């Protein structure tokens, strides 16, 4: 019985450590993304933060890394409901920089498809997977 409890506790601890590491990685990614966007598209974060804070009480980068489909809908409304414009704006403003930082610029289309279909959990899985690979590839920014 004690051995079983030890094995269970060890697995729980390893899972906890893994989750904490992912959260720390996402926090660092968020900061790198904020710095990159502030340098390359000045004022864009501030604009979208107004919308995000008013509607969801959270900044746009936190929304991007938790509920990206909500951020996409904010961009869609800002673009007057024009899907093509929203796709382009969302890709340029958020997905391309994210993909560059992750070291995989080819991710934009996949991430956009996941966001548009509301598959936020899968979006996050792709980001986390590429975050780990990006460390070995040496993502930019």
Q: What feature does the model see in each segment?
A:
Residues 6-60:
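Short terminal alpha-helical segments
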Residues 43-96:
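Amphipathic alpha-helical interaction modules
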Residues 5, 25, 35, 59, ...:
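Acidic-enriched, low-complexity/disordered segments with a strong bias for Aspartate over Glutamate
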Residues 9-10, 26-34, 46-47, 68-71, ...:
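Short amphipathic alpha-helical segments that mediate assembly, nucleic-acid/protein binding
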């Amino acid at each position: 019985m004690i051995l079983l409890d030890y094995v269970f506790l060890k697995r729980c601890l390893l899972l906890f450590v893994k989750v904490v590491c992912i959260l720390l990685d996402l926090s660092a990614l968020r900061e790198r993304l904020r710095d990159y966007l502030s340098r390359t598209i000045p004022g864009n974060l501030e604009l979208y933060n107004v919308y995000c804070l008013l509607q969801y009480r959270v900044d746009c980068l936190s929304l991007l890394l938790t509920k990206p489909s909500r951020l996409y809908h904010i961009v869609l409304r800002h673009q007057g409901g024009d899907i093509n414009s929203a796709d382009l704006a969302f890709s340029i403003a958020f997905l391309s920089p994210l993909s560059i930082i992750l070291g995989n610029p080819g991710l934009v289309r996949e991430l956009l498809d996941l966001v548009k279909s509301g598959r936020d959990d899968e979006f996050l899985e792709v980001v986390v997977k590429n975050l780990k690979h990006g460390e070995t590839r040496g993502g930019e920014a």
